[in-house]
Amino acid sequence: MLPCYLKGRMMLKPRYRILCFFVALSVLLPFSTVRADQPFQRLLPFLIDLAGWQGEKPDGMSMQMSDTNMTTATRDYERGEAKAHASIIIGPAAAGALAPIQSGMNMQTSEGRMVTSTVRGMNVLKAYNSKDKSGTLVVALDKNAMFSLAYEGVAEEEALALADKFDWKAMQAATQTK
């Protein structure tokens, strides 16, 4: 039999442990949800399934530094020997890649071409290598945001039709959301 002065302490220990557990849980839980909401996650739904193509799981990366941020979301697709790579990029890398669009660059060679134009009201750069049946379509979403579809083993017209299936305007709105 326990003395009466110890009975109160014995009851206090389990209650104290339970209280400590819930306090620790309430402190740590917000950090786990912050980690789950990475900026790239808002872009993943725009990397849609393409009919007739096998798409890998979309993935992304967000990097924050003291003076700059960069966010990317990517998805790879395959159909037999043909391949496509869709990406949405926000940050300095996108700003640099958009320079040819902003300058209105146009170039033609015997092996391919690089042409800037307007598609669906948005500035785009279409690069195509006819020998390899490969190329890239870059869509300017903002001054530091872009969507690109790189492809290989696909005719240019089909690649443009594939790129047209993505919702560029919705991407543009999402890249401007901070």
Where do the protein language model's features map onto the residues?
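Bacterial N-terminal signal peptides that target proteins for export
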Residues: 4, 10-22
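Serine/proline-rich low-complexity intrinsically disordered segments, especially terminal tails, linkers
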Residues: 28, 53, 166-167
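Sec/Tat signal peptide C-region and signal peptidase I cleavage site
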Residues: 31-36
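Short, solvent-exposed recognition patches
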Residues: 38-130
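A short, solvent-exposed beta-edge/loop patch
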Residues: 78-79, 83, 107-178
